[in-house]
A protein has these predicted regions:
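Hydrophobic transmembrane alpha-helices of multi-pass small-molecule transport proteins
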Residues: 50-69, 203-221
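Hydrophobic alpha-helical transmembrane segments of multi-pass integral membrane proteins
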Residues: 54-57, 81-85, 99, 104-156, ...
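Hydrophobic/small/kink-forming positions within alpha-helical transmembrane segments
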Residues: 2, 6-10, 32-37, 94, ...
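Helix-helix packing/entry segments at the starts of transmembrane helices
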Residues: 25-30, 100-119, 158-194
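Specific transmembrane alpha-helical segments of multi-pass solute transporters/efflux pumps
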Residues: 1-23, 64, 156-172
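C-terminal transmembrane-helix exit sites in multi-pass transporters
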Residues: 32-53, 186-206
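Glycine-/small-residue-enriched transmembrane alpha-helix faces in small-molecule transporters
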Residues: 7, 11, 56, 60-63, ...
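Membrane-interface helix-cap regions at the ends of transmembrane helices
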Residues: 7-10, 60-76, 119-147, 193-194, ...
Length: 221
């Protein structure tokens, strides 16, 4: 759980910072496919036709919402480090959700501690390695007063999100958790529209409908 949580955060955030966000998110949200396979191996959960239908609907919705204006040529760009990191992040996130469910007999405090330790440990190791290699600059501690409120706010948001995730993931089948998590794509798109960073077009409506249908099927299975 420590390794899975830490790798998820480090890989996904690194990928977003260096790659095309649309492409990274789309590759990351292949996560339900990994979840179905890992759940079969680690939890002996059956792969039912309904589970496959929910995964297909969710991925179709994500593809429609995230399809770039440039068309298929943008999705077919050369495979990059960001692409690899996005795939690693999605696989690790699926493994994280399954491990949370597998360790559901442990206290929520223990699971939360493992996730936070993993996030800090793996991200710290990656940061130190990249700084030593000269790929990223050292933090500007003299200007800490300018960025620490934002850092504190983000930390609080991550805390709330992780607590909600482990509460739900420990009580739901892994494949259902994976598909429900796809609603993040819809929420992100809607937030962009509300903040004036996007428009409410046919693609968003159609893709959002697919994602909501997938989540609805998961909730009522």
């Amino acid at each position: 759980l420590i390794a899975a949580a830490g790798t998820t955060n480090a890989a996904f955030n690194w990928a977003v910072s260096i790659g095309d966000v649309v492409r990274v998110v789309l590759l990351f949200y292949l996560m339900p496919l990994w979840a179905v396979l890992l759940a079969r191996v680690l939890l002996q959960e059956a792969i039912t036709p309904r589970a496959l239908l929910r995964v297909a609907l969710g991925l179709l919705g994500a593809l429609i919402v995230l399809w770039p204006p440039e068309g298929a040529t943008a999705l077919g760009a050369a495979f990059s480090l960001a692409d690899a990191l996005a795939l690693i992040g999605g696989f690790s996130f699926a493994l994280n959700n399954i491990m949370v469910r597998r360790e559901q007999d442990r206290s929520e405090a223990a699971r939360a501690a493992a996730m936070f330790i993993g996030g800090a440990l793996v991200a710290g190791m990656v940061g130190v390695a990249l700084q030593a290699a000269g790929s990223i600059p050292a933090p500007l501690w003299r200007d800490a007063s300018q960025w620490w409120p934002w850092a504190a706010g983000l930390s609080a948001a991550f805390l709330a999100a992780n607590l909600c995730l482990q509460f739900g993931a420990s009580r739901l089948p892994a494949h259902r958790t994976a598909v429900i998590m796809l609603t993040e794509v819809l929420f992100a798109s809607a937030s962009a529209v509300a903040l004036g960073a996007g428009t409410l077009g046919p693609a968003l409506l159609l893709g959002g409908a697919c994602i909501l249908a997938s989540a609805w099927l998961a909730a009522w299975d």
